[in-house]
Design a protein with these regions (language model features):
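Glycine/serine-rich phosphate-binding loop and adjoining beta1-alpha1 elements at the start
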Residues: 96, 115-229
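Structured beta-strand/loop patches that form or line metal/cofactor-binding pockets in enzymes
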Residues: 42-71
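Rossmann-like adenosine-cofactor binding region
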Residues: 264-367, 372
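N-terminal cap/recognition module
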Residues: 71-112
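Adenosine-phosphate binding glycine-rich loop
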Residues: 2-24, 220, 322, 335-453
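Glycine-rich phosphate/diphosphate-binding loop of Rossmann-like nucleotide-binding domains
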Residues: 193-196, 201-315
Length: 453
């Protein structure tokens, strides 16, 4: 039995009740086989795979808080500090009813390699709670965040573990948590990222994931002698990632004609009006039918069910899934290929199913997964950490310029890794495997240099 298979068997026995974590580990280790086989004796002797698949520590704690009716509520909080071989733990805090230990471990494991890809000195971790912020008052949100941070603050710090926002955790929640950390610890430090601009946040953080996605997409296309200007893009989602991906695509000369939310999707053949989309989603916080009502050229389509991914039925050269997990399935992939799609680059985390990914790659589509393509968000979080450490605030242009350089370097690194190990599929480099290998090699080199720890 190969070393990879031995470790997968061990991981499956230890984590049988955590399907998301098992899926992530299996996918990553399978893609790393050529790299691991080339160094098997060294990795086996140092138990590299056993160590890299086991978190440094897993924290689970009670979060009691009082709702507006005076009733005490209890949620469960998590922080998985997965690996700090190349820097302090770094990863978001997810607030959603679906959160459990397995999901946090899966996200933390993936974060290790994503953070490594950024070229910046940050390790991987993830946290959150099964608390649902939807429908809660500001006072209830504050009560939860303060209780959550009262426990979490014992385990984090600017040089130890620096959490950030994620699903359910925006600027409001980060502010409440930062205030509670400062109150309890008596220390003003860059312990969280995604902060407001008045207390240590970074310019361009809001735009970072969407902009970064387009910087990498453009680097990918240039490497294949394809000009992004004039290309039609299909985009899913209507949140920060989608909005700023559309904005940057338009700045680069492409035209985005779709976007979507949980109830429906827009087709606008004249190109999505970013200013109107921002007004609808960020100011009015309305559904996309409000966009269509204000835009004569736009068509609004109500989603028939959760599996209605109509944006992918529109003919496009570039597909940018920026909404949620498993939103682009095999049927969607077949439609995209039939319509002549050139590239699919992921703005969301795992938006493309395994079957769809395989189909796209085997049919010659340039495919870059979210681990590399949406790393702009965490890269800019690390730039926020740098600014906090220096007690400086960089201009938007400085941050954006550094982000562009980081995303272009990420593309170069994953392309190089795929070529070094002859990882190809459908006549193109396997950028998914390349991302895993490039991220893995940096972490492992640091682990080997630091001994058994």
């Amino acid at each position: 039995m190969s070393y990879v298979d031995e470790v997968l068997e061990i991981v499956q026995k230890k984590n049988a009740d955590q399907p998301e974590f098992l899926q992530a580990v299996t996918e990553v280790l399978d893609s790393l086989r050529p790299c691991i086989e080339a160094n098997e004796e060294l990795y086996r002797k140092n138990a590299i795979l056993e160590r890299i698949t086991e978190p440094d520590r897993q924290l689970m704690f009670r979060v009691p808080w009082v709702d507006d009716n005076g009733q005490v509520q209890v949620n469960r909080g998590f922080r998985v500090q997965f690996n700090n071989a190349i820097g302090p733990y770094k990863g978001g805090l997810r607030l959603h009813p679906s959160v459990n230990l397995g999901i946090i471990k899966f996200l933390g494991f993936e974060q290790v390699f994503k953070n490594s890809l950024t070229t910046l000195p940050i390790g991987g971790g993830k946290g959150g709670s099964d608390f649902d912020p939807k429908g809660k008052s500001d006072r209830e949100i504050m009560a939860f965040c303060q209780s959550f941070m009262t426990e979490l603050c014992k385990y984090i710090g600017a040089d130890v573990d620096v959490p950030a926002g994620d699903i359910g955790t925006g600027a409001r929640e980060i502010g409440f948590m930062f205030g509670q950390f400062k109150r309890i610890r008596g220390s003003y430090e860059g312990v969280l990222t995604g902060k407001g601009l008045t207390y240590g946040g970074s310019l361009a953080r809001t735009e970072a994931t969407g902009y970064g996605l387009l910087y990498l997409t453009n680097a990918l296309l240039k490497d294949h002698d394809i000009d992004i200007a004039g290309k039609t893009c299909a985009v899913s989602g209507a949140g920060n990632v989608a909005i700023y991906a559309i904005q940057k695509a338009h700045q680069l000369g492409a035209k985005c004609v779709t976007c979507s939310d949980s109830t429906g999707w827009i087709y606008d053949p004249e190109g999505i009006d970013v200013a109107l989309l921002k007004e609808v989603k960020e100011v009015k916080r309305a559904r996309l039918d409000a966009y269509a009502a204000a835009r004569p050229s736009a068509e609004y389509h109500v989603k028939k069910d959760a599996n209605d991914h109509g944006v992918w039925s529109i003919k496009c050269a570039l597909a940018l899934p920026c909404a949620t997990q498993n939103e682009l399935n095999l049927d969607d992939a077949k439609m995209l290929v039939a319509n002549g799609v050139i590239s699919v680059t992921e703005g969301a985390n795992m938006p493309t199913t395994l079957e769809a990914t395989k189909y796209l790659q085997e049919n010659g589509v340039l495919f870059v997964g979210g681990k590399a393509a949406n790393a702009g968000g965490v890269a800019t979080s690390a730039l926020e950490m740098s600014q906090n450490s220096e007690r400086l605030s960089w201009t938007f242009e400085e941050v954006d310029g550094k982000l562009k350089g980081i995303m272009e370097t990420i593309y170069a690194n994953i392309s190089d890794a795929a070529k070094r190990y002859n990882m190809t599929v459908g006549g193109n480099a396997d950028y998914v495997a390349g991302a895993n290998i490039a991220g893995f090699e940096k972490v492992v080199d640091a682990m080997l240099a630091q001994g058994v720890c």
